[in-house]
UniProtKB/Swiss-Prot annotation:
Residues covered by the N-acetyltransferase domain: 1-190
GO cellular component, one term: membrane
InterPro entries: Atat, GNAT_ATAT
Gene Ontology molecular function terms on file: acetyltransferase activity; L-lysine N-acetyltransferase activity, acting on acetyl phosphate as donor; tubulin N-acetyltransferase activity
Any Pfam family the entry gives: Acetyltransf_16
Modified residues (Asymmetric dimethylarginine): R305
Positions with a binding annotation for acetyl-CoA: 124-137, 160-169
Name of the protein in question: Alpha-tubulin N-acetyltransferase 1
Resulting phenotype, K244R: Strong reduction in tubulin acetylation, no effect on tubulin-binding
Gene it is expressed from: Atat1
Comp. bias intervals (Low complexity): 209-221
Outcome of substituting K233R: Strong reduction in tubulin acetylation, no effect on tubulin-binding
Purpose: Specifically acetylates 'Lys-40' in alpha-tubulin on the lumenal side of microtubules. Promotes microtubule destabilization and accelerates microtubule dynamics; this activity may be independent of acetylation activity. Acetylates alpha-tubulin with a slow enzymatic rate, due to a catalytic site that is not optimized for acetyl transfer. Enters the microtubule through each end and diffuses quickly throughout the lumen of microtubules.
Length: 421
């Protein structure tokens, strides 16, 4: 490739190495600052043209090598110039090779992921007019010597078929290790990649470091003895008395006679409880069977026994059930056909029955008061007032000539059908 400026004056050596700064390899004596700026601009022009030619040869949509990318990455480019032909005394460029270190995640033979940072071949181009003349091998070999690497330790970024044939022909690199990215590695790549040092090498390094560093190590600080582990107590190390008290049974099993005097020694409180109120002792637990047995064996009250013995009508509940005739029963017996027509005597009879029940309740309360007085004093109180008139005998009403009480009428009403249809 030819350029309008003097390439021999810009690159005095056959192979020139440029870094990301793209500076001239050597300063000529007496070169001013504007001249140095012009030289750097010429180098940038050469790099851009080489990148375009490489992209065209590899059928890439855009060049992957340019002066701007070189300045933004820590890559190295090797430029090979033609020293035999001197057209118009300016020289020519044959090709270039761009390399750089990249952090990769690659797979080994066992398909295990490995994080490595090898030297990668990023771009390689030789002009079509001078190919198969050994210029590519010369440039590649110079790079290997400069970087001190072996061909099987390299990773190639998207190599072209021509580059793979070149590596197979000159360096016997044929078998590749399959990868999931665009890089290609060959067998032997993991032979010297991040191998951990052996114990002997590690011991040798420590001994060398001790000899190189004459400063004695600081004495080890004595640590306090480790305290023995004990039982973990809830919330604090103090005893909690209320946690040891039995749970109070539900009502009525917890009903017990209260003590007349408070306990002589109340349970102590924990110091960590603060101003929380004291919990009194729980009542003793009474089994359910003993409670039921005591209820069955409990004798009735004397007043209740006397009332049951003197009442001819049975229990008080029975008297309440049979007291008078409800208005509903009277209405039912009056309005249904099986009892005949409407009889107004039923209403009067019901009123008389209700008055009779009220009189019986008054007599019963008076008798209970008399029994209580007898139980308390042992003497029968004297009656100072006028004698109470006796209640008239209970009246009843007849149905079909038979005397029937309210209980029988109620049973009859419950057993029959109340539906009018």
């Amino acid at each position: 490739m030819e350029f309008p400026f003097d390439v021999d004056a810009l690159f005095p050596e056959r192979i020139t190495v440029l870094d990301q700064h793209l500076r001239p390899p050597a300063r000529r004596p007496g070169t001013t600052t504007p001249a140095r700026v012009d030289l750097q601009q010429q180098i940038m022009t050469i790099v851009d043209e080489l990148g375009k030619a490489s992209a065209k040869a590899q059928h890439l949509p855009a060049p992957i090598t340019s002066a701007l990318r070189m300045q933004s990455n820590r890559h190295v480019i090797y430029i090979l110039k033609d020293t035999s032909a001197r057209p118009a005394g300016k020289g020519a460029i044959i090709g270039f090779l761009k390399v750089g270190y990249k952090k990769l995640f690659v797979l080994d033979d066992r398909e295990a992921h490995n994080e490595v940072e090898p030297l990668c071949i990023l771009d390689f181009y030789i002009h079509e007019s001078v190919q198969r003349h050994g210029h590519g091998r010369e440039l590649f070999q110079h790079m290997l010597q400069k970087e001190r690497v072996e061909p099987h330790q390299l990773a190639i970024d998207r190599p072209s078929p021509k580059l793979l044939k070149f590596l197979n022909k000159h360096y016997n690199l044929e078998t590749t290790v399959p990868q999931v990215n665009n890089f290609v590695i060959f067998e032997g790549f993991f032979a010297h990649q991040h191998r951990p040092p052996t114990s002997s090498l590690r011991a040798t390094r420590h001994s060398r470091a001790a000899v190189a560093d004459p400063i004695p190590a600081a004495p080890a600080r004595k640590l306090p003895p480790k305290r023995a582990e004990g039982d973990i107590k809830p919330y604090s190390s103090s005893d909690r008395e209320f946690l040891k008290v039995a749970v109070e049974p539900p009502w009525p099993l917890n009903r017990a006679p209260r003590r007349a005097t408070p306990p002589a020694h109340p349970p102590p409180r924990s110091s960590s409880l603060g101003n929380s109120p004291d919990r009194g002792p729980l009542r003793p637990f009474v089994p359910e069977q003993e409670l039921l047995r005591s209820l069955r064996l409990c004798p009735p009250h004397p007043t209740a026994r006397l009332l049951l013995a003197t009442d001819p009508g049975g229990s008080p509940a029975q008297r309440r059930r049979t007291r008078g005739t409800p208005w509903g029963l009277v209405a039912q017996s009056c309005h249904y056909s099986r009892h005949g027509g409407f009889n107004t005597s039923f209403l009067g009879t019901g009123n008389q029955e209700r008055k009779q029940g009220e009189q019986e309740a008054e007599d019963r309360s008076a008798s209970e008061d008399r029994v209580l007085l007898l139980d308390g004093s042992g003497e029968e109180p004297t009656q100072t007032g006028a004698p109470r008139a006796q209640a008239p005998p209970p009246q009843s009403w007849t149905v079909g000539g038979d005397i029937m009480n309210a209980r029988v009428i109620r049973n009859l009403q419950e057993r029959r059908s109340t539906r009018p249809w």
